[in-house]
């Protein structure tokens, strides 16, 4: 409960699905999303882009590609609902755009959990100018 409260404090003022994304990451990984992934590697975080540094960073790269494929919705502002049932994220929207947005966020949260063993603290606050150009999605 304390971790959830800390995450909420760190994400105060965050718009749209970013809040839901943060909750999903916390639920799947047990890590504070802002601290652990807010500026991780070349792709995690709002300003991230570039060739992924490791499998964790690749999760964020694929997530950005997923967002780019969305049509008619704004990942930073649109809000969706989901539930956490039996340690599984269940997207609950009838609106196709919001459902796809939720599925993008669900996929990255699961990917980050599946790649916890690749998480490297040296990439936690990686300098973006050191990132090389990535292939197009």
Curated annotation (Swiss-Prot):
Give the primary localization class.
secreted
Q: Where is this site: Hydrophobic membrane-disruption site (MDiS)?
A: 127, 130
- Biophysicochemical property: temperature dependence: Cytolytic activity upon C2C12 cells is completely abolished at 15 degrees Celsius or below.
Instruction: Identify the tissues in which this protein is expressed.
Output: Expressed by the venom gland.
Offer one example of a GO biological process linked to this entry. phospholipid metabolic process
Q: What are the boundaries of the signal sequence?
A: 1-16
Q: Where is this site: Cationic membrane-docking site (MDoS)?
A: 128, 133
Q: Which PROSITE patterns match?
A: PA2_ASP (PS00119), PA2_HIS (PS00118)
Site feature (Important residue of the cationic membrane-docking site (MDoS)) residues: 121, 124
SMART domains xref list: PA2c (SM00085)
Q: How is it modified after translation?
A: It binds long-chain fatty acids covalently by a rapid, spontaneous, and autocatalytic process. When acylated, it binds to the surface of liposomes and isolated muscle membranes, with the fatty acid moiety inserted into the lipid bilayer and possibly acting as an anchor.
- Which CDD domains does the record cross-reference, listed alphabetically? PLA2c (cd00125)
Question: Disulfide bonds, which pairs?
Answer: 42-131, 44-60, 59-111, 65-137, 66-104, 73-97, 91-102
Localization in the cell:
Secreted
Q: PANTHER family, per this entry?
A: PHOSPHOLIPASE A2 FAMILY MEMBER (PTHR11716), PHOSPHOLIPASE A2, MEMBRANE ASSOCIATED (PTHR11716:SF9)
Q: Subunit comment for this entry?
A: Homodimer; non-covalently linked. Binds to heparin.
The Swiss-Prot or TrEMBL record describes its family as follows:
Belongs to the phospholipase A2 family. Group II subfamily. K49 sub-subfamily.
**Name of the protein this chain belongs to:** Basic phospholipase A2 homolog 2
Which species does this protein come from? Bothrops asper
């Amino acid at each position: 409960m304390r971790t959830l409260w800390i995450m909420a404090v760190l994400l105060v003022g965050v718009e749209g699905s970013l809040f839901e994304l943060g909750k999903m990451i916390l639920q799947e990984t047990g890590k504070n999303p802002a601290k652990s992934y807010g500026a991780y590697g070349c792709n995690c975080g709002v300003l991230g882009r570039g060739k992924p540094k490791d499998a964790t960073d690749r999760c964020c790269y694929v997530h950005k590609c997923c967002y780019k494929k969305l049509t008619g919705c704004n990942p930073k502002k649109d809000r969706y609902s989901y539930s956490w049932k039996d340690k599984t994220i269940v997207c609950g929207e009838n609106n196709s755009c919001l459902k796809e947005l939720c599925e993008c966020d669900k996929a990255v949260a699961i990917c980050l959990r599946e790649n916890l063993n690749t998480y490297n603290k040296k990439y936690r606050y990686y300098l973006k100018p050191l990132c090389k150009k990535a292939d197009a999605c």
